[in-house]
Amino acid sequence: MTNTPKRPPAGLPDKQTLLAFLRDAGSAEKTDIARHFGLKGGDRRALREMIRELEAEGALGKRGRKGFSPSGALPPVGVADVVERDVDGEMYVRLVEASADAPRALLMPDNSGRTGPAPGMGDRLLVKFSRGAEGWEARLVKKLDSERNRVLGVIRKSNREVRVEPVDRRSKDVLLVPHAQAEGLKDGDLVLAAIEKGEQRYGPKRGKILETIGREDDPRAASLIAIHSHGVPTGFSEQVEQEAEDQELPSLKGREDLRDIPLITIDPADARDHDDAVYAQKDEDPKNPGGWIVWVAIADVAAYVRPNTSLDREARDKGNSTYFPDRVEPMLPERLSNGLCSLKEGENRATMAVRMVFDKDGRKIGHKFMRGLMRSHAKLSYEQAQAAIDGAPDETTGPIMEAILYPLWNAYHTMLKGRLKRSPLQIESAERRIRMTPEGGIGSIEKRVSLEAHRLIEEMMIQANVCAAETLEQKKTPLLYRVHDAPSQEKLFNLGDFLGTIGKPWTKGEPATTKRFNKLLDETRETEHAEVVNEVVLRTQMQAIYSAENVGHFGLNLDRYAHFTSPIRRYSDLIVHRGLIRALGLGKDGLTDREIAELPSIAEHVVMTERRSMAAERDAMDRYIAAFLEDRVGATFGGRITGVTRFGLFIRLDETGADGLVPVSSLGSEYFTHDDRSHALVGERSGLRWTLG
């Protein structure tokens, strides 16, 4: 608990008293609540029933494994970041270090008469929170960041002046820079500039050029803009590069020799690094008839990136690799990411491997981790492996059909039985891929096709990740979990309201389960509502995060889960590898006591870096798609509504996946009201409805 409110007289509180206590306390577990109100015996049972009712009503939400707090509650005063600005210019803030489902708040106009620059995107503020008619509102108390001091922009030259115009068109920070600073720069150069501090309050701000990034008309500018706009770390220091160059392949000493096991890699056709390799064989144990042994071998990054080295500090800072259509900003230097750590065909590589045993019903009945030395027997793309299984093997896949590919697929189909019983969430997502030309232009935008080969690798990786979490728990070694909380009651109530508008029953008081969601998706899959229901169910889910505390993984329907299978590109996985090394006594390069103490802060950091990368990747994708459509202005496209707000409709084009806004002012002369319950804009005179989907 964050505070300790004054203790009331003993006795069961009413619902409002309980909610008031939780608002003051921040959050509390059932035992804390019972102790505070002096409850015993039957009163404790009544308290549990009251909490269940408040959850069903959407008034209470879970916090962690056992805690409860009022749904969507914000403190009276807090530190918040400006995280969003809508097309109307209204800005929204979110509480710093808030939970994933914490509400944002509308930043209200400052009528205090204070001087100085107004808050902008990225600023950190001290604000007062309050409930408004349409949600949470925030009022500025104090700016904690004196000003935004950097602008990514384009040089615009004239005889009179040199300007830096921000690439973010919503920004008003046009800078004037001295001609002397702009010598050698050309009109259209992309630059990073600093806002000069001073007392200037009117007219363009003064700026100083920090770095020249590229050209506005370079086809690859979209990625450069995204990298710098979102602060994605680039490159490596000389010390880190040298440390990577000094690494050598470990010897077989202290490792299992796995080189004769015909492990293969199956990856995207353009993959440069190969984290994982797989192999399956029938289990010959007479006690496990119809069972399978599945091997998953992962690059042993921990053998090269040791705790508190320059390599380690750089990898932690980056948190993960970031992927753009034309480039990758890797977490590790190329010597490792595309060299010693990558499981290349025919080359000896250090590995952390897990041998898993499944019974005929797809239930995992045993596993064992080991450090080894392996040699990949084939490098396949997903399309290549799928074509072989579908009856069109090539010169690479033909010779390995009987010994490798058929056993892999047969093992996968057995594992599917266990997956079906588990019933993970089956939400469809329409990912798109940009194919670049050799010159760096955009060749095409394609929808990713989901193949059985993708699902095979996904399921084998999921099971290996489960093994990692189970082993670390069994050995009582702290770890970074990958957690995904169940949807909040508030989101479930909103889902129920929406489903009621399309005639689909949804009992609001029932607990959310993946089976229940999957049943809903199956029932609407062949109907006109399929896409919109899929979209709304997706939005109902919480974001998966990393945590030192386990709350399970709702989407996968797993009690415990960790990321183990991608240590080349995710720091979280490297931490899990080190945990296994420590827990199983597999070397001296395992998780340190200091890292164990820092697990909560590491979790928080890698959640931030993951979201930073996702935002940058989306930004670059949007810019590439916009560039692709530049010469098609005025053309007609098919699309669907993916968002409905009071100020307009968000549309996604079917062909390219481009997202755009149709302002409410362009829908006609009549007044449209926003029906939040049914996700619709409704014309007051005509009754015309623009709805999600």
Tell what function each PLM region has.
Residues 1-295, 302-347, 379, 384-389, ...:
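Charge-lined substrate channels and their catalytic hotspots, especially those that engage the 3′ end
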Residues 192, 198, 215, 225-232, ...:
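Electropositive polyanion-binding surfaces
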